Amino acid sequence: MFGFVVADAGALSEDEKERYRAVYCGLCLALRDRYGQLSRACLTYDLTFFVLLCDSLHEPVETQGASHCVMHPAPAAPRPWARSAWTDYAADLSVALAYHKVLDDVADDGDLAARAAERLLAGAYGCARARIPKQCAEIERAMAAIRTIEGSRRNSAAALSGDAEATCISPLSADAADAALAFDPDAAANEFGRMLGRLFACNQGFWAETMEELGRGLGRFIYLMDAAVDFADDTPSGSYNPFVALGSDAEAMRATLALAAADAAAPYERLPLVQDANLMDAILYSGVWAQFNKAYPPQAALAQNGGSPQSEPPN
């Protein structure tokens, strides 16, 4: 579900691009130092945004340097990096979230690659759970709730269509059918948002409530963006997807995502952010839309809508 919270490179100066890479590389080094070389596979730009956000908000002591990178052996020049205490926390979260993403993949299709990744990350997750037990417990709670929501909807949809082989259960009772028809398309997204909000709020002091609100909105956006991008694959496969269940078109998905993005932007605007402000703006206001605009180019959405102009996120 991650990989959407990235910067719009076209909106950044060269110095901002270098700063972005340095914080990203700092997170990569923190993963290596705290969890070993293999944990670098957990690296994401999503948590890089979190580091930028916390460093700007709290202005902690930051260590900077340059190191050769085994992940990028060419060019041979050392790569600049920047780290703070928030980088270490982001590394812990990266491992925990990646492990549960792998568990989700195993539950979905059980392929060998996912099972191998689960085994490789199990030890690292044990270490992360010792370091951030409350956060890991929250991730476990939320992911279990999401699996229940997604599984219930899949089974309900199959039973309503009479696909007993797919569900291995009898057709739904009248009450169960009514519940299936009245399903809440926001339920799973809300759970993911609640989880990310609580992770964002940890150790934020005075700003805990605002950071939780930001994380909650961003989490809902991430979940829904993942559903939008997977729409074409999930339609024939029958995988849980709230947009498929609702029969949404590109413009309907765009409008729903814009509301979720606004829910993240409102608390973000209330934070006293100065350092890296333009860089973070390029992530939250335009970069997060990159994969959607690639899957659903605005001009294609307009054609689908009969050519009528629509309000849309920045490209």
Regions found by a protein language model. Name each.
Residues M1-F192, L196-E213, R220, L224-T256, ...:
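Acidic catalytic motifs of isoprenoid enzymes
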